[in-house]
């Protein structure tokens, strides 16, 4: 089993099956997803607690990134995709026809595997979403830029070159800039799809430290192939295999005393 430093665990384990509505950020109910004739998710149900870090782990192709992208309807961009079931945010199914998808994605931000800054200045990257929302007051934009860059733990590194091109930053800095851009519009939920897979170990550590800070303000859901990373940063872990949610519990339980044989086999490296 993977050892976990209990001193690093920031929150107490919660009863995920009986999580009260006021403590639930998202609830996924009986979710199925198909790409054409191929089913990628099978009857997934889970509750994701507010202001904690939930990790999705599992072997390649298990459906973890597919599930993550369901949470802000990124899979809508795939023509052959068909979804059944519900994902509830504030008690409303985000797949209801009345839902404003653009508004949903403002409330549920996403950061991808590779840093994707825009070909603009550092400053304009951060305030881009705010400008789209109609914010034009320079003082308000300046305050939002500083707040977001501080929130992404990169302010001290860029405060004297805010108007330099974002492509001049290192990979790790670019990823933190992208996180700053995501939190500038103040989402409730932040989705991270393997956010450190393209980064060096030092940059990875910086992002992991940032994730533990982000949950003070946001609900964070992370997909990672790195089990040690999941053990370090998450409060809950969901293990997925072949499109099914095999086991979902507090991270300490998943990595030390899993209840399902498939989970134990994956954690101990018997496959994956």
From Swiss-Prot:
Gene3D superfamilies: P-loop containing nucleotide triphosphate hydrolases
Superkingdom field: Bacteria
Membrane topology: Peripheral membrane protein
Gene Ontology cellular-component terms listed: plasma membrane
Broadest EC class assigned to this enzyme: translocase
Binding annotation for ATP: 58-65
Reaction catalysis annotation: phosphate(out) + ATP + H2O = ADP + 2 phosphate(in) + H(+)
Domain ABC transporter positions: 26-267
Pfam families named among the record's database cross-references: ABC_tran (PF00005)
Entry's transmembrane regions: none
GO annotation, biological process: phosphate ion transmembrane transport
Intrachain S-S bonds: none
MF (Gene Ontology): ATP binding; ATP hydrolysis activity; ATPase-coupled phosphate ion transmembrane transporter activity
SMART domains: AAA
Subcellular location per the Swiss-Prot or TrEMBL entry: Cell inner membrane
EC number: 7.3.2.1
Coarse class of the protein's main subcellular location: membrane
Keywords carried by this UniProt record: ATP-binding, Cell inner membrane, Cell membrane, Membrane, Nucleotide-binding, Phosphate transport, Translocase, Transport
NCBIfam families: 3a0107s01c2
PANTHER family: ABC TRANSPORTER I FAMILY MEMBER 17 (PTHR43423), IRON EXPORT ATP-BINDING PROTEIN FETA-RELATED (PTHR43423:SF12)
Function: Part of the ABC transporter complex PstSACB involved in phosphate import. Responsible for energy coupling to the transport system.
Family per similarity comment: Belongs to the ABC transporter superfamily. Phosphate importer (TC 3.A.1.7) family.
Subunit structure: The complex is composed of two ATP-binding proteins (PstB), two transmembrane proteins (PstC and PstA) and a solute-binding protein (PstS).
Name this protein carries in UniProt: Phosphate import ATP-binding protein PstB
The organism of origin for this protein: Shewanella frigidimarina (strain NCIMB 400)
Native organism taxonomy: Bacteria, Pseudomonadati, Pseudomonadota, Gammaproteobacteria, Alteromonadales
């Amino acid at each position: 089993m993977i050892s976990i430093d209990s001193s690093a665990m920031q929150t107490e384990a919660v009863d995920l099956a009986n999580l009260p509505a006021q403590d639930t950020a998202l609830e996924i109910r009986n979710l199925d997803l198909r790409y054409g004739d191929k089913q990628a998710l099978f009857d997934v149900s889970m509750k994701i607690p507010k202001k904690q870090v939930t990790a999705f782990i599992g072997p390649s192709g298990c459906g973890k990134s597919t599930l993550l992208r369901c949470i802000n309807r990124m899979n809508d961009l795939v023509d052959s995709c068909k979804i059944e079931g519900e994902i509830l945010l504030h008690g409303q199914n985000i797949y209801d026809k009345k839902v404003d998808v653009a508004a949903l994605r403002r409330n549920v931000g996403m950061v991808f595997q590779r840093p994707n800054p825009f070909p603009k200045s550092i400053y304009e990257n951060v305030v881009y979403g705010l400008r789209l929302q109609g914010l034009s007051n320079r003082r308000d934009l300046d305050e939002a830029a500083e707040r977001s860059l501080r929130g992404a733990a990169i302010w001290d590194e860029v405060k004297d070159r805010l108007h330099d091109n974002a492509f001049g930053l290192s990979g790790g800095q670019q990823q933190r800039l992208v996180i700053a851009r995501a939190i500038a519009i103040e989402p409730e939920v932040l989705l991270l799809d393997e956010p450190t897979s393209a980064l060096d170990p030092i940059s990875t550590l910086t992002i992991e430290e940032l994730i533990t800070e982000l949950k003070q303000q946001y609900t964070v859901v992370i997909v990672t192939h790195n089990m040690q990373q999941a053990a370090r940063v998450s409060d809950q872990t969901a293990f997925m295999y072949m499109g099914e949610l095999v086991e979902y519990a507090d991270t300490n339980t998943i990595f030390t005393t899993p209840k399902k044989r498939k989970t134990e086999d994956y954690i101990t490296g018997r496959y994956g």
